[in-house]
Amino acid sequence: TFVYLPRLTEEEYDAMMEADLRDAIRDLPEVAEARGRMTKGAARMILLKYYMIKGYFDKAETLARELLEMEGRVYSLQPDYNYIFSKEGIGNNEVILQLACNNTASWYSNYMTAEVLPADYPWAEKATGWGGYVMPWDFYGTFEEGDLRLKNVVTAYTNKNGEKIDRSNSSQLAKGALPLKYGMDPDMKDGQSGIDVVIYRYADVLLTLAECINRNEGSPTTEAIGLVNRVRKRAGLSELDDAQTASGEAFNEAILLERGHEFYLEGLRRQDLIRFGKYVE
């Protein structure tokens, strides 16, 4: 006789998941033998994301500080933002967990560039552009002038026929800019890139810790402001102004905007908007 086990309660499931991740943090190595393998840092990031979803900001702050203690020894903030997502940057120590890719088999490849490119883009012979993702113009307009994170976001281009393409004559660009975050893999073929897909990285630790401090204290501290400014400095921007740090609410708004600019096309925006109560706006 086949017997169905009773469904766990949410509390039982959460407790089991948390215990499993705590065991993983204890037992896994700090540095993986190969890209994409689980480590202490990756397990901490998964648990950190769980705590943030559940609103356990005290626990999340403690865990984020454990990751902060790994800076220099295991992780660091790369000086060049765009290097993180380049062929040369594969295996860089800002990345905590990645989907290891190559361009020898379709099921191991990064298709992000192919999914963004229009069919007439100059790279399209290698990338077989599918004309998919865009960065909406409203969101593009929230970036500050000189933000280095926009370096690989294309607002206009000359196509394979030598024609100038912009938002006035392209149905794709009319919707938004082209977020070519992962750039071109020179060895790309048929849209298959060998640049790793980033899942978690150290900049997320800094901004998450800043958010936790603000939520737990009720207002931004010097430490929390400094964590955000580290990310902004790498992007070529000035420090947050007085209005952005005047209250806990204002600082939360600044963090949410910074997270959007820092992590575009990395799959984090939906959970961020839900956590900040903005998803249904």
Where are these regions (language model features)?
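Acidic-aromatic pocket-rim loops
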Residues: T104-T128, E266
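N-terminal targeting leaders only when they are immediately followed by extended low-complexity/repeat-rich tracts
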Residues: A119-A124, G131-G132, A177-K181
